[in-house]
Amino acid sequence: MYNVDFKKIRKDVHRPTRGSIEAAGWDLYAWSYENHDPVDDWTVIVPPGGQIKIRTGICMSIPSGLFGGIYARSGLATKKGLAPANKVGVIDADYRG
């Protein structure tokens, strides 16, 4: 098991969580939306064919030789058609930003 360090950049950010000890990765939580006004604290409307940037409010240190992968949750992808714009987000171990 590899250790990934997460750092919250604001107090109101949710740290990533793991669904179980056998989970393949961590669940990320939305913190803010770029160029978009949410309907309320829990609802965001993405128009058909539209895109929004969703920030997590965290930074992380990925161990050398590994990468961070951002994938759509299966339920959102199949039921709602929501997925990262490029389908898979790749974060290199040496990326800082």
Question: What does each of the following model-derived ranges do?
Answer:
Residues 1-97:
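DUTPase catalytic domain/fold
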